[in-house]
């Protein structure tokens, strides 16, 4: 409660804005994710909370488009204005460039499971250092009092995992959901989606979506699970440079992620100046 009070006072002073980003692949987005969003809104009541996901579609592994995931998010209780399509959710440049890098603190929300499984998230010795002894860009979130704005640093905060059941079975992974859907008939599918979104009336387009993209598959791709924040960092050996340079080059130097000369590039540059 004390931290939350400090947070309110600081935000009212207008010293620093707080932005919380909840990134993920979300294939599919479900009530467990929806509860994380609600938890973040409640815990950081004066912050702007966003859900960041890409529109990348990749066969069985990533079957849903951004618009399809957006529908699932709204069904799970997410405010439509909080949903942002980003090229790389774990950088979320498209969200960050809306804010002033010297007045805004950015926190990425990561699940407890991710934090526990990856040594990169071991902040037990206080400030996380790079090999050269300098502080790393991403640090553990404590409070707004001692937080740097995202021109200098980004933060990671943990979120609890909210358990839920689908047709009496506790859900532990995305693959489990997909395998259950793949082997269900129409009645079972509707019941599963009622549990998956905690609603009594499931819109027909959502039922059709799951039926067409998941229900007609004999077996699901083994790689179907969430691509976690720790996996993102493992894939990027120079993750610290990527996080900071990717975000800051675009925002501070006015460089566009689009190819020079294209309409998108020109529009991006016009928006920057």
List where the protein language model places each region.
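Cleaved targeting-peptide boundary
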Residues: 223-224, 236-238, 254-261
